[in-house]
């Protein structure tokens, strides 16, 4: 699966919605391609006081629930974006620690180039 397909899958899940008086969801979506060839998708949940979580965390939780944790490729995108966005530092570290080989995970960046978690997180654990 190429990055255009992953980005298309993520874009289909991006849709900001109010889920409660204090929380929104769906402003960012992520699609992850596993080593087994499965795609896992998640959306962010934004709440006051930083209690929410990122789309990458959501997709990884679904992936782990399905018995997988090795990520080959990933893409994230926002509600107002026609392009990919890089994972935040917290997500980079989370991706890195859920499987020993995830530092090799390829990531689509805003400019259309591809890098790895290892390059985005040079001082990884």
Model segments located where?
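C-terminal binding/interaction regions
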Residues: 1-20, 68-125
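A short catalytic or substrate-binding loop motif that flags glycine-/basic-rich loops and adjacent residues
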Residues: 22-24
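Hydrophobic "anchor" residues
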Residues: 38-39
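Compact, glycine-rich, soluble single-domain proteins
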Residues: 43-57
């Amino acid at each position: 699966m190429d990055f255009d397909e992953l980005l298309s899958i993520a874009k289909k899940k991006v849709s900001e919605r109010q889920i409660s008086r204090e929380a929104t969801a769906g402003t960012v979506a992520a699609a992850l391609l596993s080593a087994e060839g499965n795609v896992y998708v998640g959306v962010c949940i934004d709440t006051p006081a930083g209690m929410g979580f990122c789309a990458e965390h959501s997709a990884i939780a679904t992936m782990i629930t399905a018995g997988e944790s090795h990520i080959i490729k990933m893409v994230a995108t926002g509600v107002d974006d026609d392009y990919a966005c890089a994972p935040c530092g917290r997500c980079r570290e989370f991706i890195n620690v859920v499987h020993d080989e995830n530092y090799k995970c390829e990531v689509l960046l805003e400019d259309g180039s591809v890098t790895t978690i290892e390059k985005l997180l040079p001082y990884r654990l």
